[in-house]
Amino acid sequence: MHRTFKWPELLTDNGKGIAYGGDYNPDQWSESVWDDDVRLMKQAGVNTVAVAIFSWDRIQPEENRWDFGWLDRIIDKLGKAGIAVDLASATATAPLWLYEKHPEVLPQDKFGHPVNAGSRQSWSPTSPVFKEYALTLCRKLAERYGTNPYVTAWHMGNEYGWNNRYDYSDNALNAFRLWCERKYGT
């Protein structure tokens, strides 16, 4: 079944419904509980969930290894139950292997020390290395799920500036200077 995403008319036969749900992190639980999760969602009237917000490490457990199997299964399970998927970019938290290989993706505090990895948005938004890896991830997600009828929205991110609102790295300084040049012409 193909659904056209038209906010706020979503998911109902008469076009009068709105999205009702929240974040769902199935990758943090045993697959054996997913059926109960979906049943309880249906019982609560949930018709949309945001999935994969913190899942980059599960989707790409190693630099050259991708695992979409679990995501395929949960999207299919949700969709067949009539619950639409708002698929996240999964960039809210980068995998630890990325920080280990490229510590320069971490933001820096005002003393030049890297901010610890492992929390939401522990990456520098101006890091070209982070952007390259994040873009690869987003392309893979779009290629795989771009035509999936159960994916009705793309969750690009929220709560910006959580752990990276202050970044004193050279990349941040250069990005700010470029912004000033473009805005003020000097």
Where in the sequence are the language-model features?
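Boundary/entry segment of secreted carbohydrate-active catalytic domains
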Residues: W7-V33
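Solvent-exposed, acidic/flexible segments
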Residues: D27, E31-W34, N64-F68, W123, ...
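Active-site beta-loop-alpha junctions enriched in small/polar residues
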Residues: N25-D27, F54, A90-A94, M156-G161
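Repeat-mediated protein-protein interaction surfaces in helical alpha-solenoids
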Residues: H2-K6
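Polysaccharide-binding and catalytic clefts of secreted carbohydrate-active enzymes
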Residues: F111-T186
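Aromatic-lined substrate-binding rim segments of carbohydrate-active enzymes
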Residues: E9, D35-N116, C138-A142, G146
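Hydrophobic faces of well-ordered beta-strands that scaffold small-molecule active sites
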Residues: I18-G22, V49-V51, V85-S89, T152-M156
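A short, mixed-charge helix-start or loop-turn motif at secondary-structure junctions
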Residues: Y20, W56-Q60, S119-S124
